[in-house]
Amino acid sequence: MARITPITQYRNIGISAHIDAGKTTTTERILFYTGVNHKLGEVHDGAATMDWMVQEQERGITITSAATTTFWSGMAKQFLSHRINIIDTPGHVDFTIEVERSMRVLDGVVMIYCAVGGVQPQSETVWRQANKYKIPRIAFINKMDRTGADFLKVVNQISTRLHVISVPIQLSIGSEENFQGIVDLVKMKAIRWSEHDQGITFKYYDIPKDLLQLANKWHMNLVEVAAEADDELMEKYLQYDDLEEKDIKIGLRKRALNNEIILITCGSAFKNKGVQALLDAIIEYLPSPKDSYKTKNFINQKDSIKNYRYADDKQPFSALAFKIASDSFVGNLTFFRVYSGIVRSGDVVLNSVKDHTERFGRIVQMHANKREEIREVRAGDIAAAIGLKNVTTGDTLCDVNHPIVLEKMDFPEPVISIAVEPKTKIDQEKMGLSLNRLAKEDPSFRVRIDHESNQTIISGMGELHLEIIIDRMRREFKVDANIGKPQVAYRETILNKIENVSGKYIKQSGGRGQYGHVVIDIFPLKPNKSGYLFVNDIKGGVIPGEYISSIDKGIQEQLKSGPLAGYPVVDIGVRLHDGSYHDVDSSELAFKLAASHAFKSAFKLANPILLEPIMHVEVETPEEYMGDVIGDINRRRGIIEGMVDDMIGGKSIKAFVPLSEMFGYATDLRSKTQGRASYSMEFLKYTEAPRSIYDSIVSTQ
């Protein structure tokens, strides 16, 4: 089957924003104008297409990144039909993993900002994630119809808070209840959309006289920005003191794709104004898979040399699995992005990360939670597969004869844990199954058994994250459970190097005995980076090679539950350099236990400490409560990083606060500010816990 849409007419984009910036409403308007939906869905009445989970409809927030495909030929039908694959991502910081894995497979992002609230905390988090993957982006300043809307103030805030050159390609005509349309600064025309057909039709007008001077100023600004794209455009600009429309677009596109600028549009999705022009901007200024840097420079699995793959159907097949989702009818759905080549249902491919083959069963095109079965997918496509058995998020799928490993994703470590106890024997059986399925979907969610208390402990990125998991367990899997209080996920490590610690396991009781003897050094590694390092320095065969992996395994088992208080051990290196063995009695088990004893003894001598998670907290508060808020942060062992004015005359306070001090903060903040302040927090790093915390935790173990 030949390709229907040329790859240059593809746009793989994400829609991302702070919570409540109007992101899902904007996506719903995109689906309406592109003909996917024939009626408008609203978030406030729970009818949004992309928010299909019950939890999303109840809370009015987006939890999972829903995917859909649509087509657009321009407001004035001026383009060939372009295929737009859209991923709508969450705005709540507890679901950062959903944003992260979407960013990994996208070519461009639309960042949505509220015309009243401006750049809010989660906007900065998402911006950093887009920077990490070098994704070109354009901004849509939404809610221009709301009281307090100020387009140019938000433009300025984007420049100052996100450290980027912001280039408006539109101006708003009026604001608040007088918002009527936009000025297109490239064409130098005003655009107004019809209120009789929900904005499907539009007309160009002359720019209103009261806006003409401002429009000329910003038009010249974008001409200068476009001219700086290359020498040829700069020559034209210097010769004519202006550029033609097509040259402006070439220059702006070039600089946007190089991440030198962010182009800014505006509108009101709710009032059906501006989303249509945003769609045109997506086609004109965001990259196709051919333009995207991610299509080349991956690592060949076998020889670790750089290998190139381009977004081309003729190249060997390569794809990245970026999300696993449970489906009540078909089991696991594996969402994947094809970078090169073609794959058809029934094809056998290599999972190059796990080094085993997989057969593609059915391939489906997703629209939120609806599916359409298709026979094949090609370079640039985003689809879901049914029937892949052992694929996890971040795995590379590729041609069996041309192995390649694509750039992996980084997943954050969970920072908060709670105990869950099933209420009945039947619940107990179902709970293990349901939690494992949910953990397979979400790499930032972990499940473990505490062997001392025999409790099931679940860990995640925040209280809301775990609340949603428990809610899904109850609704989707019908599991009833008692929930414990949130616990901080501490870590254990050491400060000093300790050498020549011996560990022995000897058992002689008639017949064949057990004998293992190891001598190790342990040493600290750089914090928050390295995890664990095992160095085998055995010389002269004092311990046979077949026992080395058992020694490593014995140490790694101890890392899962540290000697201090049973928390995971991190940032530690172990050097094995001596020991002895017995010809008859030595075994893998004996060396594993000997290593375990040696590690425990060495750890206790190496000045062990507890590490606690530190959160980056941002509080937005009216100025009159600022003193109370800062005082409260200080009482919670917080360190104030800085303060800036926010868009609505208040203060935005940034601080570093230990997670253990943040439980119940939402309630305390509401009461201190009469409900007028809000906050967000995200994990920053682990640092040494104070002695008082250390003593209270270690003494209870």
Swiss-Prot record:
Keyword Repeat: no
Keywords (A to Z) from UniProt: Cytoplasm, Elongation factor, GTP-binding, Nucleotide-binding, Protein biosynthesis
SMART domains: EFG_C (SM00838), EFG_IV (SM00889)
Residues annotated for GTP binding in this entry: 17-24, 88-92, 142-145
GO biological process, one term: ribosome disassembly
GO cellular component, one term: cytoplasm
Molecular function GO terms recorded: GTP binding; GTPase activity; guanosine tetraphosphate binding; translation elongation factor activity
Domain tr-type G span(s) in chain numbering: 8-290
Superkingdom to which the source organism belongs: Bacteria
UniProt-listed Pfam families: EFG_C, EFG_III, EFG_IV, GTP_EFTU, GTP_EFTU_D2
Tagged with keyword Protein biosynthesis: yes
Family that this chain belongs to: Belongs to the TRAFAC class translation factor GTPase superfamily. Classic translation factor GTPase family. EF-G/EF-2 subfamily.
Function recorded in the entry: Catalyzes the GTP-dependent ribosomal translocation step during translation elongation. During this step, the ribosome changes from the pre-translocational (PRE) to the post-translocational (POST) state as the newly formed A-site-bound peptidyl-tRNA and P-site-bound deacylated tRNA move to the P and E sites, respectively. Catalyzes the coordinated movement of the two tRNA molecules, the mRNA and conformational changes in the ribosome.
Descriptive protein name: Elongation factor G
